Each structure stands twice: as C-alpha cells, then as structure tokens.
Swiss-Prot record:
Name of the protein this chain belongs to: Collagenase
Protein function: Has collagenase activity. Hydrolyzes type I collagen. May play a role in virulence.
Record GO terms (molecular function): peptidase activity
Superkingdom field: Bacteria
Higher taxonomy: Bacteria, Pseudomonadati, Bacteroidota, Bacteroidia, Bacteroidales
Record keyword Nucleus present: no
Length: 414
C-alpha cells in the first residue's frame, strides 16, 4: 500500500482549527459557510469572504478544501444554493459535499467536483453506481460493517464504476468523532422538541441530555442503568484502521467542526501516523496504545467501534459533555515573540502558570502549539510560577502572535 492512496479529512470550524489541521498533516479539510450545511448552528461558520481566504491557504499548503452544502434544500433555497456553489467555483474550492440532487446537478453543470454526504445513507453498490454520475467520492453509511464495505469496493473495481472525472469512485468513511443516535444523522428530535431542524443544520443536541423513563399507566419511574439513553459514545477506529484500509476505504473523515484546535490537531496527527504506520509495517499494539492515550486527552464521550466490526446495538455514554482525561484552562494572551531567542511574552489574565505545566497556544495564524513550560521569567528573573496581572516570558518552539490565547492543561477530575 502507498500512503498517498489515503486521505485524512479534517473538520474545520475556525481559522485556528484550519491551521491546526494543516500542521497535523491533514490531506484535506471540510467546512461550511453560513447556511445550507449540517453545522450551521453548532459551529462557528465562515462567511463567503472567508471562502476565498481558506481556499488560498489550502492551495498554498497543498491541502484540498471541501465545502459542505449538505442540508435539506427547499425551492426557496435554490437561489442561495446556486450562489454558494458559484462562490465555491470562483474560489477554486476542491469540491463540494452534497446530499441534494439539485446541488449535485448544478455543481456538475458548472464544473464543480462533487463528493456525497453521509446524509444520503448509501449502503449498497447499486446506490453508489447510481450516484457515481454525480460524484467522484462517496461516503458510505456509518451503519455498514467492513464486509459490506469490502463488497462495495470490490464491485467498484470489478465493474469499473467511475465518477464524472473518469476515475473509479473513492470510498470515504467516518473514522473518528461524534455519532448520531439516528440512522446517518437523519434525526427529527430537535425539530419536534424545539422546531429546530437537524436536517437543516440546526440540531439542538437534545439526545445528549439525561432522561428518566416512566410507565405511562402506573406513573412509576423505571430503574434504568444509564440516563443518557440516546447519547452514543464517540466513534474511534484507530485500532482497526488497517481493516478499513484493506476493505477499500480511501478517505478517512474526522467529525468535529464544533471542536477546538487541540482536538483537530491531536486526532488528525494520530490517524495520519496510523495510516503511515500500516503502510510502512510499523502498525502494532504499542503504537495503538500510544494513540489511544493521546486521543483520550481531547473531547470525547467515551469510545466504541461503531457498527464497523459487526455490532448491531449502540453503546451509550454515561456522562453529559466530555470525558477527556484533561481540560484546558484559559491563562492569558500573547504579547510579543522574540524569534532570535525563541521566547514569547504573555500577559497572565486568569489563574496561575507553573514550571512543568503543559500548555496549548492557539491563534488564527498560529493554529495550535502544545508543549511544556520549561522556564518562566518575570521582570528578567526566573520564577517558579506566574500569577494574574503579570507579564511573563517563556521559551516557545514556534512563533507566537499578539492576542494568541494561552491555556494550561489540567487533569480532569471525575
């Protein structure tokens, strides 16, 4: 296997996450602008003006850029849909991710590459064959197992099922991140409860709440093991990514456009390393254990294998929010970087910072820097800790920009 045959696709909801993904070695990024994307409400979406800047950054870095246009589209949305795809064409975005045939057809008409969204729930080779007239990359349903994926891949190869560009259709699958309790994300709970449609990018995440179960006739509350009965654990595939590669998956999609840059960086880096390791023969239990430990440090609701290995019932989280082994605490902001010395000046605005603390620095150009504090200087003197109100300097291995944010990682207490 050649590592260049595979692609890590990173989620991007901010410039910090964009630069973090690029730094981690992502091959492509996906993002949304304003409306018509499945994270229109939950992530900090970009504007049409951002589209051109993101496309330029990605081209300069050799990274593909994918724009999501994958919500349910009504007649009154057609003009907006066309204007968004027109902007994608002008910005030279690599492809759009679509689920509505209207978006696919229009993109094809004006020469914009199309990739298919998980919202289509493509679960068999014949459905893929039909949609191949529109798309060069197809994401398969998250409910499939690896035997089913392999069958679809073998059909593509045997029948030479090609997309509009004339190349065999590439299979994309989710590799890591949040899962929906509904099939391929087609959920109506949010619409029913809050008149806020998940299928229009406005999911209120009410499945993540805790619930009690009562007998309607007797009024008795049932004793259930877990109150989070509709909130799945997060998908993690790094311990069997070799099986996915062997089954024909070529694009590995990471969920998390609403997550921070440290999440994007850590997850992308781990999966990139795993793919490279399998290709060069160093994929083993020791490496998997190291990646598992790193993945546990960033946002997660606990992990499971999804349905990929044949499991038919979901696994549900036992908590609300993140179960990461550590949390980031805001400490201060960047003031100046002294490149010759490799030292950054920060203003401490909250809490304390100690020698030995692990920190993360984030910014729209910086992306993310993760390192330990080896030395702290305050008024030219070495000190053991820094406190609120002080301007301090610490060695930093990369350039820090004014107003970059400084966080301290703390161990999360259960």
């Amino acid at each position: 296997m050649n590592v260049n045959d595979f692609e890590i696709m990173a989620p991007v909801g901010s410039y910090e996450s964009l630069m973090a993904a690029i730094k981690a070695g992502a091959d492509s990024v996906y993002f949304g602008i304003e409306g018509l994307n499945m994270r229109a409400r939950s992530a900090n979406n970009f504007t049409t003006e951002d589209l051109y800047k993101i496309a330029e950054i990605c081209r300069d870095k050799g990274v593909k850029s994918y724009l999501t246009v994958n919500t349910v589209i009504y007649d009154e949305d057609i003009a907006l849909m066309r204007s968004v795809i027109d902007a994608a064409q002008k910005a030279q975005i690599s492809a759009i991710i679509a689920s509505d045939v209207a978006a696919m057809m229009y993109a094809n008409e004006i020469g914009v590459e199309v990739h298919l969204s998980t919202q289509l729930n493509i679960s068999n080779a014949e459905a893929l064959r039909f949609y191949s007239r529109f798309a060069d990359v197809v994401v398969l349903a998250r409910e499939l197992n690896m035997d089913q994926v392999r069958t679809i891949h073998e059909t593509i190869v045997r029948d030479n099922i090609c997309g509009p560009k004339g190349h065999p259709v590439r299979i994309e699958m989710f590799a890591h991140g949040a899962l929906c309790m509904a099939v391929s994300g087609k959920c109506y709970l949010s619409l029913h409860e809050h008149n806020s449609s998940a299928n229009r990018g406005a999911c209120a995440q009410i499945c993540r709440r805790g619930y009690t179960v009562k007998d309607k006739d007797s009024g008795l509350e049932l004793d259930i093991e877990n109150q989070y009965i509709m909130s799945p654990k997060d998908l993690k595939t790094i311990h069997f990514i070799n099986k996915m590669m062997d089954a024909g998956v070529r694009v590995f999609k990471i969920e998390g456009r609403a997550r921070g840059p440290e999440y994007v960086y850590t997850v992308c880096r781990c999966y990139k390393e795993a793919i490279e390791a399998y290709c060069n023969g160093t994929y083993d239990e020791e490496a998997i254990g190291r990646w598992d430990e790193q993945l546990a440090t960033v946002f997660n609701r606990g992990f499971w294998d999804g349905y990929y290995l044949g499991q038919r019932l979901g696994e549900w989280t036992h908590r609300y929010g993140s179960g990461a082994t550590r949390q980031k605490i805001y400490v201060g902001k960047g003031i100046k970087y002294f490149s010759r010395l490799g030292v950054a000046e920060f203003e401490i605005e909250s809490g304390e910072l100690h020698i030995g603390d692990e920190i993360v620095i984030t910014g729209p150009t910086t992306g993310v820097i993760i390192q330990k504090v080896e030395e702290i200087r305050y008024e030219l003197q070495t000190v053991e800790k820094a406190t609120k109100g002080q301007r301090i300097s610490i060695p930093v291995k990369e350039k820090v920009r004014p107003s970059d944010k400084l966080y301290r990682f703390d161990k999360r207490e259960e």
